[in-house]
Structures are given as structure tokens and as C-alpha cells.
Swiss-Prot record:
This is Adenylosuccinate synthetase isozyme 2. It comes from Sus scrofa. Pfam families: Adenylsucc_synt. It is found in: Cytoplasm; Mitochondrion. It catalyses: IMP + L-aspartate + GTP = N(6)-(1,2-dicarboxyethyl)-AMP + GDP + phosphate + 2 H(+). Mg(2+) binds at D40, G67. GO terms for biological process: 'de novo' AMP biosynthetic process; IMP metabolic process. It comes from the Eukaryota. GTP binds at residues 39-45, 67-69, 336, 362-364, 444-447. Its main location: cytoplasm. Plays an important role in the de novo pathway and in the salvage pathway of purine nucleotide biosynthesis. Catalyzes the first committed step in the biosynthesis of AMP from IMP. HAMAP family: Adenylosucc_synth (MF_00011), Adenylosucc_synth_vert_acid (MF_03127). GO terms for molecular function: adenylosuccinate synthase activity; GTP binding; magnesium ion binding. The gene is ADSS2. Its EC number is 6.3.4.4.
């Protein structure tokens, strides 16, 4: 071979690879926290725990339709678009290309949290935004509301969206008419022209929509000045973080597995991939850099809005879970529907995400029950089905097979180790582990940081 002649050392290389460079996976691994049910599992709390010694905390998908609550020093912070890990003053927060950003919402959220306590001081210097992230405009949000109204009028039911413009902006993205952060900060004249075209498209689709185009552009110019120092090439930033000195990088998933656009209970889902694949596409990183994948599971099941919910308890049990768990959406304030834990759903979420461990939250909400049911199988026409149905009509028809476990009927909110939990509470956790074949790493028994019991 000519190459071998010009490179005599090549012949001594193993496998006869003639000195060709070989790509080897390397670099830091990212730790991922994902919701395993329909959202509101307590992801923010797990992220808050892990963010205490993290260097970078990332958001990879969704927008300000998510809602995370974190309590630090008795101050309750609410996050929708910002990674909740930004509460740690030593953390760099990164909003990836898969996230959709409503600029007024971003600044409003930051300013509200700054007024609550010291957790967000200096946030503007600690936030990096991918230049490839798409922008949510006010008319996307207005169109979201109109679409919901139309669904209600035409079909008698809507999707129960948060009306934050998430569906419309992802539609613009897929239609290649959306605008990104790089457009805003690089060439405002070019951005303005494209904004006018997009706004006029929306006005022609929704004749009742009123858009003050010049007024909007004036506002956006003001936001552009403020946001410009935060906008960076996200792919390059993350590559440097992965391949530079050792760093702890945390990814905070928004929404949850059963709300995923592909794998969720479609059409009652969000518009992004909130399963593990969305981490790679939403940040611009290869799958071999994904390390631990933690699934966050509430000790029972909740869902906001309409859609199939096999283990729902539309009765006193559901009401007790709702009031004890204070089940109201952080983003919408809507009451959450409540039911027993569903292991069929969790096995399905695990098939997609490959959870390495679980965080089981709000176990203390079950303190009042003398017996607790867990959904272990679905039956259709009297036969057990081995999968989680994709079709909503089919999912609505399944009959859940339950396993009844004895409750502990005692307050566990002061437990700080696994051994301090009553035996029946320990058995409940072990039953979940055995059925799912995934270890439980944390158990939540209250709202504060201290009330997360770590098992290993």
C-alpha cells in the first residue's frame, strides 16, 4: 500500500489499521433527569439535589410550558423556562437548541424569582442560550388560544394546552418559517423582514388575530440588546464542556415520557421529545456522552387536562390524593387528576429511556391509606396485553389489574433514612423495584431538600 510506504510505522500498528485515526468515545458524561409519567413528578427537586455540586445544568426541550418548584432556605422558587439548577450560584445554566424561548416570559420569570430571594442573583452572567433555539412570539401564544377555542367548538374538547405558544412555535420550526436566536442577534434588519412575513402568515390563517408588527419589533429590539451577551454557539459550547476538564453536567428534562410527541398519549401530548432522545437532539451531543438517566416517579399517578388515564380514581381516593398532595399545576393552576401508581406505564417509559435508577417522590402523601393499590397489568377483552397501547380509544378501554399492598397509616415526613420508614413503606418501595427491575435511589417524604432519602 502506498500509504504504508510513506508511513513505515503504520505496519507495526495493531489490526493493520495503517495509522488511520480512530474515533473513540471520550469526554464527560451528562446526568439526565426525566419525568417518567405525565409530568409534575418532582423533577425540580431531584435536579436541585444534583445541582448542588454540578458545573452546568441544561434544558434541552420544551418552553415555559413546564413548571418546576424548588424550595431553598424556606423560599419557594418557580421555574418554567430557566433550568431550576440556576439556583446554585456556582452553576452555569444552558438553554439548548431544542428549547423554544419566549423572551418576555424569560425575563419576567427571572425577575420574579430575583425578588423572592438570593437564589437568582447574577443570573444574567450565568446563563448561556444556544443560538439555534427558536423564538416564541406573542402571536404564537395568541394562536395557541385560538386553536384551543376552535377545537372546543369543532370537536367539543380541546387538548388542554398551557396556551404558551409551544405547539405553534414547533409548527413554525417544522415548516421552516421559524426564527432563531441567531437571527435576532446577528442581523436585526433581516430578522425584521422575516418576522413581518411570519406575522402576516399568522394574520391570514387567523383573521381575528391582531398583531402590532412595528410595536412587537420595537420590543424585540430591546430584548435583543439584553439577550445578546448570553447567546452562544450551543454545539461548540457543549463540545468544549464535554471534552475539556472534568465537569459535572446535568440535564433537566421538562414535561415527561407520556407527554412525548412520539411516545406519549397522542394527541394529548406536548410538541417536543421529552424522552432521552430529546437530550441529544436538543443539546447537540452524541448518545455516548449520556451517563446516568434518572427517572422521576411520583408514588401515585397524576395528570393535568384530558386524555386516557387507566389508574385514575374519580372518587374519594382521587380527591384525597389531590388535596393531600396539593395537586395543582405550577404553570396553569389547574387541578390535577389523581390515581394509583401504574407500573405498566412505567415499564413502557423505561423501555424508551433506559432508566439507570429512579427517584420516588411524594411517598408521604400515601400515609393516610390502610391499603394501597398498584396497577400491574392491562387487560383488553379479558386478555392481558403485553404492551402499552398507542391508540387512545384502546387505552381508554383497558381494565387495570391491581395488586393491593398494606399501607403504613403513619406520618413518615420525618424519616431521613430508609430504615426509619415503616416496614410497609419499605415493602412498597421494594415491590416497585422488583416489578420494574430498576433500583430506587431517592425517596421523597416532604417538600424540603432534607426530606429526600438517598438509598445509595
Amino acid at each position: 500500500m502506498a500509504f504504508a510506504e510513506t508511513n513505515p510505522a503504520a505496519s507495526s500498528l495493531p489490526n493493520g489499521d495503517c495509522g488511520r485515526p480512530r474515533a473513540r468515545p471520550g469526554g464527560n458524561r451528562v446526568t439526565v433527569v426525566l419525568g417518567a409519567q405525565w409530568g409534575d413528578e418532582g423533577k425540580g427537586k431531584v435536579v436541585d439535589l444534583l445541582a448542588q455540586d454540578a458545573d452546568i445544568v441544561c434544558r434541552c426541550q420544551g418552553g415555559n410550558n413546564a413548571g418546576h418548584t424548588v424550595v431553598v432556605d424556606s423560599v419557594e422558587y418557580d421555574f418554567h423556562l430557566l433550568p431550576s439548577g440556576i439556583i446554585n450560584p456556582n452553576v452555569t445554566a444552558f438553554i439548548g437548541n431544542g428549547v423554544v424561548i419566549h423572551l418576555p416570559g424569560l425575563f419576567e420569570e427571572a425577575e420574579k424569582n430575583v425578588q423572592k430571594g438570593k437564589g437568582l442573583e447574577g443570573w444574567e452572567k450565568r446563563l448561556i442560550i444556544s443560538d439555534r433555539a427558536h423564538i416564541v412570539f406573542d402571536f404564537h401564544q395568541a394562536a395557541d388560544g385560538i386553536q384551543e377555542q376552535q377545537r372546543q367548538e369543532q370537536a367539543g374538547k380541546n387538548l388542554g394546552t398551557t396556551k404558551k405558544g409551544i405547539g405553534p412555535v414547533y409548527s413554525s420550526k417544522a415548516a421552516r418559517s421559524g426564527l432563531r436566536m441567531c437571527d435576532l442577534v446577528s442581523d436585526f434588519d433581516g430578522f425584521s423582514e422575516r418576522f413581518k412575513v411570519l406575522a402576516n402568515q399568522y394574520k391570514s390563517i387567523y383573521p381575528t388575530l391582531e398583531i402590532d408588527i412595528e410595536g412587537e419589533l420595537q420590543k424585540l429590539k430591546g430584548y435583543m440588546e439584553r439577550i445578546k451577551p448570553m447567546v452562544r454557539d450551543g454545539v461548540y459550547f457543549l463540545y468544549e464542556a464535554l471534552h475539556g476538564p472534568p465537569k459535572k453536567i446535568l440535564v433537566e428534562g421538562a414535561n415527561a415520557a407520556l407527554l412525548d410527541i412520539d411516545f406519549g398519549t397522542y394527541p394529548f401530548v406536548t410538541s417536543s421529545n421529552c424522552t432521552v432522545g430529546g437530550v441529544c437532539t436538543g443539546l447537540g451531543m452524541p448518545p455516548q456522552n449520556v451517563g446516568e438517566v434518572y427517572g422521576v416517579v411520583k408514588a401515585y399517578t397524576t395528570r393535568v387536562g384530558i386524555g386516557a388515564f387507566p389508574t385514575e380514581q374519580d372518587n374519594e381516593i382521587g380527591e384525597l390524593l389531590q388535596t393531600r398532595g396539593r395537586e395543582f399545576g405550577v404553570t396553569t393552576g389547574r387541578k390535577r387528576r389523581c390515581g394509583w401508581l401504574d407500573l405498566v406505564l412505567l415499564k413502557y417509559a423505561h423501555m424508551i429511556n433506559g432508566f439507570t435508577a429512579l427517584a420516588l417522590t411524594k411517598l408521604d402523601i400515601l400515609d393516610m391509606f390502610t391499603e394501597i393499590k398498584v396497577g400491574v397489568a392491562y387487560k383488553l377483552d379479558g386478555e392481558i396485553i403485553p404492551h402499552f397501547p398507542a391508540n387512545q380509544e384502546v387505552l381508554n378501554k383497558v381494565e387495570v389489574q391491581y395488586k393491593t399492598l398494606p399501607g403504613w397509616n403513619t406520618d413518615i415526613s420525618n424519616a431521613r433514612t430508609f430504615k426509619e420508614l415503616p416496614v410497609n413503606a419499605q415493602n412498597y418501595v421494594r415491590f416497585i423495584e422488583d416489578e420494574l427491575q430498576i433500583p430506587v435511589k431517592w425517596i421523597g417524604v416532604g417538600k424540603s431538600r432534607e426530606s429526600m432519602i438517598q438509598l445509595f
